[in-house]
Amino acid sequence: MWVEADINRIRFFWNSGPVGMIQHDDFWDLVCQKVNVYRGDVSGTTTNIINLDDGREIPTDILLCGTGWDSTYRFLSSTQKVELGLPHKPCKDSDEERRSWSELVDTADRQILQQYPILGRPPSDCKPIGGAGLTPARLYNGIASLTDSSILFLGRARMSNNFRGAEAQAIWATAYLDGNVTIPPLKQAKREVAYMNAFSRRRYPSRGVDGLNFHTDLVWYTDKLLCEAGMRSHRKGWWEDPDEPCLASDFEDCKEEYMAVYGSKQGR
């Protein structure tokens, strides 16, 4: 098995590399016995050889490419992406819009560095991954367009527990579409979005360039969504909440709570 990796570049605090969950007890035993790690870039392949850019040749029977996924919404026009607040080329913004967002992000950035000075000193090898040349996503809570209340974008934000994140986003989206959540006035909403974008970029300099990385901010993020939806964010009890992991199963009774708060005709 051939694996391209660079363990030295991965730092958990800065989330500079992908993070996974060990699902099997024998995972590391299998890796240490069966996996050879080669660090480098692929320059080409032949019938049964992978060529690296440093001249090494790696015999192989099969090559698996983990190419990621495309979140560019190809079915939307470039104009629609700008209007909805999805990542787009800055040149598509009007001069006034570009200047307004730049001022908001700069203000948020100064506030963040004043409050968290360490974020101004990331490792030199934490380079942005993806999103080069595009604006960040300008979505309230990483979900809602600031200009069109009829559409939401779920699942774009990256979190350390996507199951919990998905549950919280679904609850917030239900309340929003039911009319039980309203986003702040536009000026305030833009300030909050700019802060979220700037924080994502500073906190996660490699993977936060699109403004939607909440990897170690999972609990804050899901608490915010539930509170805005009028639900209880602390659901286990005064002792268990600070002492036990936050899981998707914490929200298992949210449907009943939602109907109790807003009525049985909603939240279906």
Role assignments for model-derived ranges:
Residues 1-268:
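N-terminal FAD-binding dinucleotide-binding subdomain shared by FAD-dependent oxidases/monooxygenases
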